Amino acid sequence: MQVEVDLPNHSYHIKIEEGCFSEAGDWVSHLWQKQMITIITDSNVEILYGESLVNQLKKQGFTVHVFSFAAGEASKTLEVANRIYGFLAKHHMTRSDGIIALGGGVVGDLAAFVASTYMRGIHFLQIPTSLTAQVDSSIGGKTGVNTSFAKNMVGTFAQPDGVLIDPVTLKTLGNRELVEGMGEVIKYGLIDDIKLWHILEEMDGSIDSILDNALAIIYHSCQVKRKHVLADQYDKGLRMHLNFGHTIGHAIEVHAGYGEIMHGEAVAIGMIQLSRVAERKNLMPRGISQDIYNMCLKFGLPVHYAEWDKDVLFDILSHDKKASGQFIKIVILPQLGSATVHQIPLEEMRDYLEK
């Protein structure tokens, strides 16, 4: 399967195929000239896939370096980015060279941020190995690092030269790491793909059902992401639909401490909380929040956040990128499979944090 992303100033393809990681070197050689490559990965993924990718690339004639950092959301910082800049400079990486992001969402966001800012931008590729990265963060060109104030507070828009997705890599994830990716998959069904939602309804929620249906849910998710990115590359209109559940979700991630609540888990809680309040305000049809709750519960996603503190959460989300002056934009669902953006006074977000 292949998904084409044809933007006005840059086009690339997303290759989705079981077992395609074993052909990654050949894939890269068709996209890039023989040059220097730095693979950016984390301590977990390096053990699983680092040596294989290095050998494949060297076989194709590339000069290869590897930068690995401690796995986890806590590494997605400007401090780690600065260490990578130093590594690239030490190895004399130039604008004719390239970076490959090999790993999950943290690796992809951080590596893409570095690629987009080092020497004002060098080429990069994404090889995502987690479900969250395969369906969401590796696609669309958003890069970023976290700060103590907010998630992804510092970032850029930069498109990769290609994305290689091998669903087989999901088999090496722990159960929690696999399940958290379903938070984003469920979101896609809710905002713009009723067929995907029906696929999820037919699944029994087990780990085996996720792995057995991985190719289909990844493909559907990539198609939804592609549609929104093509229509709104810089997140000013339609693409904002992809933020459903993320305003509250990101606040939960910051409040809990990066990595304590995984991204997809926080999004699941955020979607449920926002939908319940939106229903009470008659902005969404009754029953959708229960549908979301039931779906998240079926797949083993958390549906509550035990450390809920509405005042602290409000202070955190006041730094959200969707805030503008004294207003903030939220995403609501007129019906299953459809989304719209609704602007409210920032102060009204306190209502959406009421349990």
UniProtKB/Swiss-Prot annotation:
EC number(s) from the headed UniProt entry: 4.2.3.4
Keyword list, A-Z: Amino-acid biosynthesis, Aromatic amino acid biosynthesis, Cobalt, Cytoplasm, Lyase, Metal-binding, NAD, Nucleotide-binding, Zinc
Keyword Glycoprotein attributed: no
One of the protein's GO biological processes: amino acid biosynthetic process
Pathway: Metabolic intermediate biosynthesis; chorismate biosynthesis; chorismate from D-erythrose 4-phosphate and phosphoenolpyruvate: step 2/7
GO cellular component, as recorded: cytoplasm
Positions of disulphide bridges: none
Transmembrane segments: none
Note describing how the cofactor binds: Binds 1 divalent metal cation per subunit. Can use either Co(2+) or Zn(2+).
Top-rank taxon, per record: Bacteria
Protein name according to UniProt: 3-dehydroquinate synthase
Lineage summary: Bacteria, Bacillati, Bacillota, Bacilli, Lactobacillales
